[in-house]
């Protein structure tokens, strides 16, 4: 096996343990993060370290990890108040003999959970299954409302800053 950036190969029993070393962050602001699962998925695919069924699953997972904007899954979108959708791969684990990859998304008001789930199912095809989907409608309060103005004015008065309100998932 070949070495790769942010991948370590460690002898283990009769095989090799492949570890990915990423950079953590938050699903609402994933810029600059590197998902270790995505690194390992790419390494396995690039080096042909999977059978056909595993390849189909890994290709589906790769679509999640290819872009924190959801491009690989066909769910990328943006609107004025919220900006672009963000999505990250969370934890991967073995559950009842099946690999499970969690994901976490913050999406703008121009889409909804049902639409996103439908788009993800279309993108992953038969390589994986999307289950346990939960979503909440985006919540937004205009920056010029009295409550938000009171909060930011108080913050600026206490800190001496000149901060402005911002939206995050």
Please annotate each region the language model reported.
Residues 1-38, 42:
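Fold-level recognition of mixed alpha/beta catalytic cores in primary-metabolism enzymes, strongest
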Residues 5, 14-16, 85-87, 99-101:
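Structural beta-strand/beta-sheet cores of well-ordered domains, especially the beta-sheet scaffolds
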Residues 15-23, 101-103, 137-139:
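A generic structural motif
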Residues 10-12, 81, 95, 122-124:
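A generic structural signal for short, solvent-exposed coil/turn residues
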Residues 2-4, 13, 84, 124-125, ...:
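Short, well-ordered coil/turn elements that cap or connect secondary structure elements
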Residues 3-8, 47-48, 122-128:
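A common structural junction motif
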Residues 28-96, 106, 110-115, 129-169:
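An extended, acidic, His-containing surface patch that forms the Zn2+-binding/catalytic region
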């Amino acid at each position: 096996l070949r070495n790769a950036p942010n991948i370590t190969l460690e002898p283990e029993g009769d095989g090799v343990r492949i570890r990915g070393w990423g950079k953590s962050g938050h699903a609402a602001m994933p810029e600059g993060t590197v998902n270790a699962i995505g690194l390992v998925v790419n390494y396995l695919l690039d080096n042909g370290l999977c059978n056909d069924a595993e390849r189909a699953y890994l290709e589906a997972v790769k679509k999640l990890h290819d872009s924190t904007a959801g491009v690989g899954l066909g769910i990328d979108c943006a609107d004025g108040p919220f900006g672009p959708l963000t999505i990250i791969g969370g934890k991967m684990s073995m559950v009842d003999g099946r690999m499970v990859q969690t994901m976490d998304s913050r999406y703008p008001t121009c889409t909804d959970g049902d639409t996103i789930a439908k788009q993800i199912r279309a993108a992953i095809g038969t390589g994986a299954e999307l289950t346990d989907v939960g979503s909440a409608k985006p919540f937004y309060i205009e920056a010029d409302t009295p409550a938000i103005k009171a909060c930011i004015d108080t913050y600026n008065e206490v800190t001496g800053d000149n901060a402005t309100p911002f939206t995050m998932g």
